[in-house]
Amino acid sequence: MCGIIAISGVELDTIDQKRHLQSLHPRGPDAQDSFSYDNNVYMGFTRLSINDLSSDGMQPMQNDDKTVSMICNGEIYNYKEIAKKHNFNMKSKSDCEV
């Protein structure tokens, strides 16, 4: 199971984000990534690769214009069907992208 951290409502300068993300390493030993927005929203993710082992499946994921960001730890078994139904052009093989 992957690790997820989200921090909001505080000035990020006052928080050791890297330390918090590192504490989740046992939950997702394959990779980690994070991003922050406007110095008051932070999202971090430690990855346990299952479906898409490439970097394309890494999270947090963002849409093309970076107005929407998401992290998901789950299994969407019919993700190919959902993507086809909604004509969604997937960039990865990750079920969470839909």
Question: Predicted segment positions?
Answer:
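N-terminus-centric sequence/structural signature that marks the extreme N-terminus
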Residues: 1-98
